[in-house]
Amino acid sequence: MRKFFKYFLFIVVFLFHGFMFSVVNYVFPHYDVTRVTGVEVKRVDKDGPITKSNPADGPTRDVYYINTQNDDGKIMVYRNEDTRWGFPFYFKFGSANLQAEAQALGNDNKLVQIKYYGWRITMVDEYRNATSIKEITADDTPSNPIVSWILYVFLLATLFLSIQFIRGWFDSDK
């Protein structure tokens, strides 16, 4: 029974830390260096984009999209939507301004750095949300998500300490 409880605690610790790694990866900002190839706006409601087959049936909002392609040819689409006061707390209110800036940079085919959070999951139409965009040159060093790295190291340390604590707790009673 003690062995079962020990392995159960290991599983709980691994699941908790896996969840926390996922939260840090989703919520904290990342940076991509790319070129803007286009922008678009879609009117959506709670069911998704409004079309003939999906008419509006409630409050609607505009969702902006920024289409990009990096120098390797990889294409990525970013959602550009206000977070307002909601989670994650980026307090982003200027999506239209960011869209205009992206369009101007795309017209000039300039190299840009996009700061974003979230994941791109194609199967469920989940997009990364762009929070800022800035022009960079090929000589510039791209930004790095330092806070994320610090939290990853912290989570690895707590995972290691949790495992050592559980092992010590159960092995000391032999």
From Swiss-Prot:
Transmembrane segments: 8-28, 146-166
Keyword Acetylation recorded: no
Lipid bilayer topology: Multi-pass membrane protein
InterPro entries: Phage_phiNM3_A0EWY4
Keywords: Cell membrane, Membrane, Transmembrane, Transmembrane helix
Subcellular localization(s) per the UniProt record: Cell membrane
Family matches, as Pfam families: DUF1523
A cellular component annotation (GO) from this entry: plasma membrane
Protein name: Uncharacterized protein HI_0453
Organism, scientific name: Haemophilus influenzae (strain ATCC 51907 / DSM 11121 / KW20 / Rd)
Organism placement in taxonomy: Bacteria, Pseudomonadati, Pseudomonadota, Gammaproteobacteria, Pasteurellales
